[in-house]
Amino acid sequence: MYAIFQSGGKQYQVKEGQTIRLEKLNVATGSTIEFHDIMMINDEDNIYIGDPILHNSKITAKVIAHGRSKKLHIIKFRRRKHFRKHQSHRQWFTDLEIINVSY
């Protein structure tokens, strides 16, 4: 059984027991969080599709850790003009463990 839900403007496909990395959520480490913006649930026998979301359904997850991803380097360069520009970025993330998918 898997579900597709929306968080932070992105959609994720998850199963029970799976670990997933999302954009940073302002929730304490070790606490549980519920997602109600579920778009689709695929049970072994049935497929439930929302219009646009499924009502009376939720995904329960446990917050494992917060952190920052590897550094991403952005380099701008113009040939023959002696122009080089360098920037870096590290994105915050939250790791979750999916506990339960219910509908």
Swiss-Prot record:
This is Large ribosomal subunit protein bL21. PANTHER family: 50S RIBOSOMAL PROTEIN L21 (PTHR21349), LARGE RIBOSOMAL SUBUNIT PROTEIN BL21M (PTHR21349:SF0). InterPro entries: bL21-like, bL21-like_sf, Ribosomal_bL21. Part of the 50S ribosomal subunit. Contacts protein L20. Disulfide bonds: none annotated. Belongs to the bacterial ribosomal protein bL21 family. It comes from Baumannia cicadellinicola subsp. Homalodisca coagulata. GO terms for biological process: translation. It comes from the Bacteria. One of its GO terms (cellular component) is cytoplasm.
